[in-house]
Amino acid sequence: MQAKGDTAIGCVLAFLRRQAFGIAVLACAATAFAFPSAFKEWGGVKLMSLVVPAIQIIMFGMGTTLSAADLLRVGKRPWAVAVGVFLQFLVMPFMGFLLAKGFGFSGELAAGCVLVGSVAGGTASNVIAFLAKADVALSVTMTCCSTLLSPFVTPFAMKVLAGCFVEIDAMKMMVEILKVVIVPITAGGIVHALLKKQFDAHKAVCDRILSFISMTGICFTILALTAPSRDTFAAAGVAIVAAAVIHNTIGYLSGYWLTRLVGRFARLGEAEARTVAIEVGMQNGGMAGALAVGVMNSAVAALPANIFSIWMNFSGSVLASWWGRTAGVRKKTVER
């Protein structure tokens, strides 16, 4: 007979395994906050200057996992994609603006709140969708679509909503998105097409390697952006964290319930609702951080994206763990 202590320890270990990435993200943020000088510069190189290359590597890895089928899938799931894009590029940027105003942020900090709401879906969303028993194929398609739209929509949203806080060079931002996101993804797609047989033959290994690279890149970005913005974070305190939590929660709730509402006549179910919720709630914080550094040259503007990334990766892991456990129960209920 198994002892209660063993059962408790097993539950704790299982929980830690499920939340491993979220815990790693929190640990990186706490470490950089506690020892900022250790993560500002290595060997004369400012770590913040390596954020853009890190995001480019992540985007290249994402490109190697995509195919033409991911885009063609839009025709099969138009309503789900439409709901996701609507929330991603209209509701989330506007909520970033309202939160910045509501919490009394100004200048680069306020612009950063709008920026994190104006970027595409996060690269970690596909992994979270898998763990949450959502529609992974739809998740990949939505991430792909929002990313391809971002060079045009993100600069426009920033110009309209963040222009009252700081001067926004929309053209420079468009070029930066093309350089940081679109070019690496395209290059990754070309490599995948040229080496398709090799990728298909070793898919499991490639997926594990790419996931590790992506997660490592995200953790590095958090370290590199938390250290130089520590003082601003300490000054903003609870307000900037509260704004990130509210923004993320609104993304999850609006994505889930609007999809359920549209699903009444568009044949969208629980899996689609979970997918849209994850895609909308999990913004590409790394991309927002790279734009803050590359276009605005500001660690302060990158702070909201950094806090959002830390929180969303933790909340996403918790949400995926809960949904993953309840998927079977909900399915049985529907079948009855």
List the model feature ranges, each with a label.
Residues 293-336:
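C-terminal-most transmembrane helix of multi-pass membrane proteins
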Residues 73-74, 124-135, 260-263, 290-297, ...:
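Helix-loop junctions at the membrane interface of multi-pass solute transporters
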Residues 87-95, 118-124, 139-159, 178-184, ...:
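Membrane-embedded alpha-helical segments of transport systems
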